[in-house]
Amino acid sequence: DLTCTLYSFTGKPTQVKQVHTVPGKETITEVRQHTYDHADRLLRTSYQLNTDAPVTLVDHVYDELGRLKSDRRNGNGKLRSDYAYNVRSWMKSVSGPLFSQTLNYQESMAGTILCYNGNISSMSWKAGSETTDRGYRFTYDGLSRLKDATYGEGNDLTTNPNRFNEQITGYDKMGNILKLKRYGQISSAAYGLVDDLSLTYNGNQLLAAKDIATSGVYGNGTDFKDGANQTTEYTYDKNGNLIKDLNKNISSIGYNCLNLPDQVIFGNGNSILYDYGADGTKLRTVHTTGSTTLTTDYCGNAVYENGVLKMLLNEAGYVSFPDKKY
């Protein structure tokens, strides 16, 4: 690859041109244009692929205090987000057509213990065209460690309560979680306990996780899969790297001289292999599942799967191939 960069007098990159070449394949040229305001804050990034028309990846607007006020991606109004802050410049809300979220600190809400130290006392969100808020109320112990996340819906989070609660019922003296309960959907019309975990440690290293919950999560939800019942389910090397995870059926994890994982071997024979450059940059991943092998190569911001260009990564996401969609 060849990369050429133009800079402003203050050292900010104003144009970056990348030429990506692979023998026998089409040459790809990417050009990024960066625009800044009087305070050298990024205002806009445009992107041109080969001879296609340039597109705007990101637009930034700042308030009088220099905080990000809004951004828009790909020039699409639906991908706009507006940001609001309180008087302490703590994030208060993110709002947009596709997702909105509100964070509360000392603001009053039914059943909420107000927080004046920066802890979030409650949060709520809506996605897409949803009209009902979903959210959590949080409680903490005397060391500001999370104790309870209580789920609810509606303006005061009192509708459909407790469906997706999480409870941490104990910490050890070093702050490690000893017991954790998670609730979720257990059938088409019922909600209940899906995880009841007890965690044991050797110092700060997790040794085992035992789940005594009798119900599994329903549908496409996720819960902890207790794949082993051993005294030691997680094993580490002398550098503290995890080398075995019985709950995930990982029989071996190998590391290179940079302490980066270079192979993961599963008990069923499946494997993941990683290759890196001398600086630790990941260059290749090889997933082997049964008789199927998927090789992913990382060439700068270009990602190939089995030798075919899959995507080009950029500041706003990626360009997929061969359809060239942003």
Regions found by a protein language model. Name each.
Residues 1, 101-134, 200-248, 293-326:
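Short, ordered secondary-structure scaffold segments
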Residues 4-5, 34, 60, 81-83, ...:
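A residue-level detector for well-ordered beta-strand positions
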